[in-house]
């Protein structure tokens, strides 16, 4: 099956994955993670296939002697919170995240919300599933226990609020699991919000729940622009609410690495000297802002499982990824889009400037954006060529792909990575000036496309 991905299990329901597959995956997960006889949190999103897939997954866990802690409809951050706060042995989130309605899947964790990725277990689970018929006798007799964590989760997230004045926010839930996150804003008088698409609908009828694609933000932008001065900013959640995109009070998109810098700035006020991670595609201003705010900036490779591992190893309080994942030590070193929302609200409430003016200094340098190139030459050969060409001209390192750091000598940095799933090479580059960026961008693209 091609459903076993780098970070989760995902496919088109009824075509790539079925209830029978989910039953086997559940049993394989229980065996691999060693949770037989233990307690596992299971949450699900609002897709039309999620209920029946939950029933099959729960049956598989029960047949491995697992007590299933069924938290019902919930966001991925809520499932992480339940895993950690209930001291469970693992958690499962049934979701296909931002994928369209035809898809479904699951995200698997061990205890303390430690993710199981392709590199740390998904491939092992795939092998176990391949050896199953689905008619194996039970290895135990577990049970299903319904647990409601929504109120506790809301209280947990609200601890992040330290607003100096009222802040009014526009929220686009895209008919997805951001709706479950709204519990985090109940009982907080200083943060109020107006909502778009706040009814669960697994068909996602209004737009895809993917804030990484700017076109999905159009309705949120239109709401803000139709009401000048009403909203401090807007937030759009993805399908399972572990990612968020933000727009300012004018409806203009805030780049996600800028959001990383702003959130770190807020957190470091109460955590001086703490480590904050930014992913290696981020603007240099993320690193500089963290340092200027009294923090210790550290660069991470791309991918949530890698980032979480690096955060734990370095006792980091926060990490931000260019994809819109924002990770908090306070949420068991996992994502919380609502904590990110509170962090921005905290910043706005403490300033006499609107968010657009707080973002402006972060535009100091010139970024290429991510440029993807389909190549005939094997991507590994291209990366090796870049490493050889620049080894004597700059600091070259291989945290994720090949990075070339000539910031001090020539005023630019570049990162060239392979796609995990396609024959693509991805280039991200930033220059101290637009002229430097464009010249170096063209130089690197000429090598990649040769």
Short names for language-model regions:
Residues 39-104, 185-247:
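N-terminal small/polar loop signature for handling phosphorylated ligands or for N-terminal nucleophile
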Residues 71, 123-155, 159, 250-322, ...:
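Proline/glycine-rich low-complexity loops and linkers
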């Amino acid at each position: 099956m091609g459903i076993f991905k780098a970070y989760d299990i995902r496919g088109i329901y009824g075509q790539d994955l079925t209830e029978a597959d989910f039953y086997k995956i559940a049993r394989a997960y229980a065996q691999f993670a060693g949770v037989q006889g233990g307690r596992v949190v299971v949450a699900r999103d609002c897709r039309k296939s999620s209920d029946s897939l939950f029933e099959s997954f729960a049956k598989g866990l029960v047949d491995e002697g697992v007590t299933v802690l069924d938290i019902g409809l919930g966001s991925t951050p809520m499932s992480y919170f339940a895993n950690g706060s209930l001291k469970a042995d693992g958690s499962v989130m049934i979701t296909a995240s931002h994928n369209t309605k035809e898809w479904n899947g699951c995200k698997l964790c061990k205890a303390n919300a430690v993710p199981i990725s392709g590199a740390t277990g998904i491939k092992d689970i795939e092998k176990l599933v391949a050896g199953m018929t689905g008619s194996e006798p039970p290895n135990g007799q577990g049970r299903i226990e319904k647990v409601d964590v929504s109120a506790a989760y809301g209280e947990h997230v609200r601890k992040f609020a330290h607003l100096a004045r009222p802040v009014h926010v526009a929220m686009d839930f895209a008919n997805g699991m951001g709706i479950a996150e709204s519990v985090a804003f109940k009982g907080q008088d200083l943060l109020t919000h107006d909502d778009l698409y706040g009814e669960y609908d697994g068909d996602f009828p209004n737009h895809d729940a993917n804030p990484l694609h700017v076109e999905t933000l159009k309705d949120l932008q239109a709401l803000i622009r139709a009401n000048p001065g009403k909203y401090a900013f807007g937030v759009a959640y993805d399908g399972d609410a572990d990612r968020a995109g933000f727009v300012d009070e004018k409806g203009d998109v805030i780049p996600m690495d800028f959001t990383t810098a702003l959130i770190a700035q807020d957190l470091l006020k109460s955590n001086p000297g703490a480590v904050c991670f930014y992913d290696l595609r981020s603007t240099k201003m993320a690193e500089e802002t963290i340092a200027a705010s009294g923090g210790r900036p550290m660069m991470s490779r791309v991918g949530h499982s890698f980032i979480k591992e690096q955060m734990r190893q370095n006792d980091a309080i926060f990490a931000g990824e260019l994809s819109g994942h924002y990770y908090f030590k306070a949420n068991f070193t996992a994502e919380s889009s609502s904590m990110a929302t509170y962090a921005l609200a905290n910043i706005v409430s403490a300033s006499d400037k609107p968010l657009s003016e707080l973002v402006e200094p972060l535009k100091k340098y010139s970024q290429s954006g991510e440029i993807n190139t389909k190549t005939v030459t094997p991507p590994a050969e291209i990366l090796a060529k870049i490493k050889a060409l620049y080894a004597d001209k700059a600091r070259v390192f291989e945290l994720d792909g090949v990075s070339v750091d000539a910031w001090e000598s020539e005023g630019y940095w570049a990162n060239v990575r392979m796609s995990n799933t396609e024959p693509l090479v991805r280039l991200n580059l930033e220059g101290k000036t637009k002229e430097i960026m464009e010249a170096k961008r063209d130089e690197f693209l000429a090598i990649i496309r040769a």
